[in-house]
Amino acid sequence: MVQYDNRYTYEGGNPYLRPCIINNVDFNAVYDWLLFNAGYNYIDNPMVWVATLYQGKDIVFLRNINFNHRQDVYASIVASPRFGWYNPMAEIDYSQSFLHTDGFDINKPSNRPCFNFRLNNRFNITRSLKAFLNMRYKTSQLNDLQYTKPFARVDVKLTKSFLNDALEIGVYANDLFKTDKERWTMYGSHTIMTKDCYGYGRCVGMTVSYNFNTAKSKYKGTGAGNAEKRRL
């Protein structure tokens, strides 16, 4: 079956796909407010979204194809300390994939490591007034055959609760500096596809929520999850 996207792009299935087998080793360690994770994947017959030419014409044909194998290595460290009214969460992630394309006429960039940096800040100004400043930066990444350029994002939010924390009103602004862009290049067999655009994630808004389960009673429950729901 072939799906028509536009005059230059088709999509289709592949009846000759074989199942992939994933072998994984993962390690986790937690100490107080510090968390560490590292792992390794070895994937036999990985299914990869590939662009080729359709019947030798100037038309890109996208479908899944089995490659020989792929190896992934990754690690992350997360720190969530508490300093009274200030609660930060810092995260650093490392990942790198090695897709073996032997036997395929595909000229892709060399594999390179990818780093993701995240810093979420929570400020408990008063018991009912909280501010949030979330920042993220991700370096360039080669995922299978798609190279993605770096991007960054900054979000802010302010919340105020009323009526013994039953009512909460919040205002927020996402992607303050308009830096969360979608920019990538996909390498295929005699084809290269690129995209460089902004997804219009920059916005401001307001939220209003009301919790109907703040009172303790044997019928309504204890509201044990309310604090966690407000945090999220």
Where are these regions (language model features)?
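Outer-membrane beta-barrel signature, preferentially recognizing the C-terminal barrel domain
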Residues: 1-44, 60-73, 199-202
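Outer-membrane beta-barrel translocator domains and adjoining extracellular loop/strand segments
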Residues: 1-3, 7-10, 42, 46-55, ...
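Residues on the lipid-exposed face of transmembrane beta-strands in outer-membrane beta-barrel proteins
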Residues: 17, 25-31, 75-83, 94, ...
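Repeated loop/turn-to-beta-strand initiation elements of outer-membrane beta-barrel proteins
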Residues: 33-38, 85-90, 127-133, 164-169, ...
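Structural signature of outer-membrane beta-barrel domains
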Residues: 34, 41-45, 84, 95-99, ...
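Gram-negative outer-membrane beta-barrel transporters
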Residues: 42, 61, 66-138
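C-terminal beta-barrel architecture of Gram-negative outer-membrane proteins
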Residues: 94-99, 115-162, 174-177, 186, ...
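C-terminal beta-signal and adjacent terminal beta-strands/loops
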Residues: 162-232
